[in-house]
């Protein structure tokens, strides 16, 4: 096997994401004619500690959301540095990209520029070897298909409705394969649509393909999902569990949690009580961002109260950053990390965060963003690292479905080697 292959060109362009905003797409060209391509996602609710997504700010073009500066940074500064590099030396290339930027948050060149290059390099290397990306990144032991954390009711900043919490999801832990898991979720999704219609609710979709009805309360979202699970022929708490992304930083104001649509203002302790009541009442297996990104004491209390029986996922809390994750591990905040490639900006840093989480006994959930493209890198990544869980929206809208379809292909390719762990993917809780 050739272990040296030069990069001969790097080309970026501005494309559109699923929310009709510009994003960066990068192609890396190799001396043997191989091409690797990657497109960068973008978030709606973003943590304050995320790596910087560079936007042009020109109000006359795409309402200031253009990314031509990031594109130019790739085509000029980054391309000049990468041409002649060995495509198989991913850690070196990622280190060089970080040093080329020179800032703590990738604010000079833009995390959207840097990530596009980092992922395109990995795709080019895999293509040159004739390997699937998951095999190139994960090696011979990459075999675990993920339990989907499927968003079927959207609220918060992902929808224009009366629901405070951002995402209500289903997790088909009772399935025996990813193929079966996807079918189960699709059946519940269609059943939920009919259930909402029967109740007189609208069935318009949010950013991630979930329904966005104006429900009477946050709890009604769970009630109607459980009803749909039952009508679809499954048992909530056995075949399917509920997962929530509270996105609490979005309604954390002056040290309090303001649930405007319910007319409640809660302290950190009261917010923990709120979730504990729900966990005791409903078959909830995972809560993401239950507390705000700066409420470390609240996170610690939440973990003390619920961390043995519910997965507590830090998204805005950790932003795929090893420094923040290390602090969380030290003080006992959360027991899981959400992994978003564009929060940190390179493949190598992402893999480092997953490794740190695993060493600490934390689960890792590989995630999309609300602004997505047809790029399926995260589908390969979740199998490469055997994470066992993926969060990539509803089984609707092609930018979400593309990820699920890629996982179907991977499961087919792995054949009998493929593992679907179901409830065992939650290895650090008792449920």
Swiss-Prot record:
Cofactor note: Binds a second Mg(2+) ion via substrate during catalysis.
Recorded catalytic activity of this chain's protein: (2R)-2-phosphoglycerate = phosphoenolpyruvate + H2O
Main location: cytoplasm
Residues given in the record as Mg(2+) binding sites: 245, 288, 315
SMART domains, per the entry: Enolase_C, Enolase_N
Described function: Catalyzes the reversible conversion of 2-phosphoglycerate (2-PG) into phosphoenolpyruvate (PEP). It is essential for the degradation of carbohydrates via glycolysis.
GO cellular component, one term: phosphopyruvate hydratase complex
UniProt family annotation: Belongs to the enolase family.
UniProt subcellular location: Cytoplasm; Secreted; Cell surface
PANTHER family associated with the record: ENOLASE
A Pfam cross-reference name: Enolase_N
Protein name as annotated: Enolase
EC number: 4.2.1.11
Pathway(s) the chain acts in: Carbohydrate degradation; glycolysis; pyruvate from D-glyceraldehyde 3-phosphate: step 4/5
Binding site residues for (2R)-2-phosphoglycerate: 166, 340, 369-370, 391
One GO MF term attached to the UniProt entry: phosphopyruvate hydratase activity
GO biological process: glycolytic process
Residue positions of the active site: 208, 340
Gene responsible for this protein: eno
Family matches, as InterPro entries: Enolase, Enolase-like_C_sf, Enolase-like_N, Enolase_C, Enolase_CS, Enolase_N
PROSITE patterns: ENOLASE
Source taxon at top rank: Bacteria
Known cofactor(s): Mg(2+)
Keywords assigned: Cytoplasm, Glycolysis, Lyase, Magnesium, Metal-binding, Secreted
Disulfide cross-links: none
């Amino acid at each position: 096997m050739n272990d040296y292959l030069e990069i001969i060109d790097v080309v970026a362009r501005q494309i559109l994401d699923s929310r009709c905003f510009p994003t960066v797409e990068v192609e890396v060209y190799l001396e043997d004619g191989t091409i690797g391509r990657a497109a960068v996602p973008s978030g709606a609710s973003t943590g304050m500690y995320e790596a910087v997504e560079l936007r042009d700010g020109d109000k006359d073009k795409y309402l200031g959301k253009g990314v031509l500066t990031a594109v130019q940074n790739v085509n000029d500064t980054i391309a000049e540095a990468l041409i002649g590099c060995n495509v198989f030396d991913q850690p070196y290339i990622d280190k060089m990209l970080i040093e080329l930027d020179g800032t703590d948050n990738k604010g000079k060149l833009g995390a959207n520029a840097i990530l596009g290059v980092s992922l395109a390099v990995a795709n080019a290397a895999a293509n040159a070897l004739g390997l699937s990306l998951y095999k190139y990144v994960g090696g011979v032991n990459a075999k675990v298909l993920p339990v989907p954390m499927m968003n079927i009711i959207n609220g918060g900043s992902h929808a224009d409705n009366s629901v405070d919490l951002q995402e209500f999801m289903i997790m088909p832990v009772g399935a025996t394969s990813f193929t079966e898991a996807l079918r189960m979720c699709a059946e519940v999704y269609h059943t939920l649509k009919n259930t909402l219609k029967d109740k007189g609710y609208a069935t318009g979709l949010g950013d991630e393909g979930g329904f966005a009805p104006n429900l009477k309360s946050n709890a009604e979202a769970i009630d109607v999902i459980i009803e749909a699970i039952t009508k679809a022929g499954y048992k909530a708490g056995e075949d399917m569990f509920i997962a929530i992304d509270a996105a609490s930083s979005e309604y954390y104001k002056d040290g309090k949690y303001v649930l405007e649509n319910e007319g409640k203002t809660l302290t950190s302790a009261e917010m923990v009580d709120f979730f504990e009541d729900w966990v005791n009442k409903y078959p909830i297996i995972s809560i993401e961002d239950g507390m705000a990104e700066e409420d470390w004491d609240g996170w610690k209390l939440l973990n003390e109260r619920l961390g043995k029986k519910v997965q507590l996922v830090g998204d805005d809390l950790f932003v795929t950053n090893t420094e923040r994750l290390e602090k969380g591990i030290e003080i006992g905040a959360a027991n899981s990390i959400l992994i978003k490639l564009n929060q940190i900006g390179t493949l190598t840093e992402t893999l480092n965060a997953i490794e740190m989480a695993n060493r600490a006994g934390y689960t890792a959930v590989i995630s999309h963003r609300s602004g997505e493209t047809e790029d399926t890198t995260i589908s390969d990544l979740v199998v490469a690292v055997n994470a066992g869980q993926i969060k990539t929206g509803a089984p609707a809208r092609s930018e979400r479905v593309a990820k699920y379809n890629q996982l179907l292909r991977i499961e087919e390719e792995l054949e009998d080697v493929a593992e679907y762990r179901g409830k065992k993917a939650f290895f650090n809780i008792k449920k």
